[in-house]
Amino acid sequence: ACYCRIPACFAGERRYGTCFYLGRVWAFCC
C-alpha cells in the first residue's frame, strides 16, 4: 500500500513523489 505522509516516509518505505493535500506537500511513500 502507498501513503501520503508528513514530513517524510517511514523506515523501509520509498518515496516516489509528492502529494498535495489540504494545501500542503506530502511525501508519497510505498
Swiss-Prot record:
Keywords: Antibiotic, Antimicrobial, Defensin, Disulfide bond, Fungicide, Secreted. SMART domains: DEFSN. Belongs to the alpha-defensin family. Transmembrane segments: none annotated. Disulfide bonds join C2-C30, C4-C19, C9-C29. GO terms for cellular component: extracellular region. This is Alpha-defensin PhD-4. One of its GO terms (biological process) is defense response to fungus. Its main location: secreted. It is found in: Secreted. In low salt conditions, has antibacterial activity against the Gram-negative bacterium E.coli ML35p (MIC=2.4 uM), the Gram-positive bacteria L.monocytogenes EGD (MIC=2.2 uM) and methicillin-resistant S.aureus ATCC 33591 (MIC=3.5 uM), and the fungus C.albicans 820 (MIC=3.9 uM). At high physiological salt concentrations the antimicrobial activity decreases significantly: E.coli ML35p (MIC=7.1 uM), L.monocytogenes EGD (MIC=1.8 uM), S.aureus ATCC 33591 (MIC=>50 uM), and C.albicans 820 (MIC=>50 uM). It comes from the Eukaryota. InterPro entries: Alpha-defensin_C, Beta/alpha-defensin_C.
